[in-house]
């Protein structure tokens, strides 16, 4: 018990607290200095950054300037002011929705939720179906089939998304085939937001299904044979045996897969980068990456605020499942 608590404090509690503290600060304002630049045609004065003074400020206060919770409510995050102004100035709901979807945080929120709510159930169902199918195969072909099935999970997300990105390109095998089928040389899966979202969701299902398959396949080996044999004697067909014997036995496993898949899908990032879909699809992880990819000015405060809001959203999404699981655990004791 003690080692577990120590590990949770070191690897979970302390990092979250440090991120929260960082979210309360923003970068120092760069001090300026007047510089005189001379050339053969004369001298002129320009305004530049006082590098030495800026370095001294960062050394004195490495966290930056204290900003409190203002970062959480600025335009790049919860944007309460912009939402209020958009609601007040909009005559129709469609006008307000345009304002809503133009805000970075809510744009990322909608895509992240859509991606998670579509990919998670499809992954569970597809993984379960694949596990049932492979479990009935003969031993000679079962091994190679399992290896081929888990290949999408072996491939790193970034490489897998890049390969699919090249395949759906207009000159790729999938992109050119779709153009031939619809007789439209200008049709592209990367041309619209909806098609981009569908492509990303399809890739997510393809990449994460092997994980669900492996867990379900391992759990199928633990299904007791006595209830199945009794069901066969009673005349139950295959579907009835799966419905009344297998599924109840695998329900806790399905809950486990749902929890892991939801947490994994919420932090979707590599497919967006691999598909170059930043203009059409943004996630919380991409917002954090966007804040930190500028080497000269890294917005640590903004990235930390997005991280805390992501943690809160994960907690909200997982709370119903955790409560239900806890109640069932208490009833079974």
PLM feature segments, named:
Residues 1-333:
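A structural signal for multi-pass alpha-helical bundles of membrane permease subunits
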